[in-house]
């Protein structure tokens, strides 16, 4: 029994490095399915092969919500850089054939909450509009990303303002991300259909 136990322990210790390597490889392979690169330039480079096969990408920047005004400014600058990079890579393919970008509104303002609605609308909307206009200049799609459920109404207010913005009239690159598992998803879809009709925009919807 003692020798059998020792042999099993030896095999167990000997197999640990292989198990670790296997787990590490598996995690890396899974990660590459969702994270294309550590920055936008790497992500664009790593996506070229799939794009040539007909895949379309909407790029998100991973990160948390802004906690301070300097955080929000850094995220704003990062989004501007990303839109320039994606726009150049898109090479005027248009909002349906080329890549796009998703924006996390809570990254653009440190107080993105209903309690601060007046301040948020006054301070965040000009930043959001500037990014959307930049995307329009490159003709790449730009989606407002999903946030926590209590922020949905505020996101919709900002979306509606964009849809009726005169400088964006006739452009169909505005999009919105829906959390399909929420109970109010059907009502939200109806609202977005109605908004598209009222504003004469074909909205880009992503689940």
Language-model segment annotations:
Residues 1-207:
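Positively charged, amphipathic and often flexible ligand-engagement surfaces
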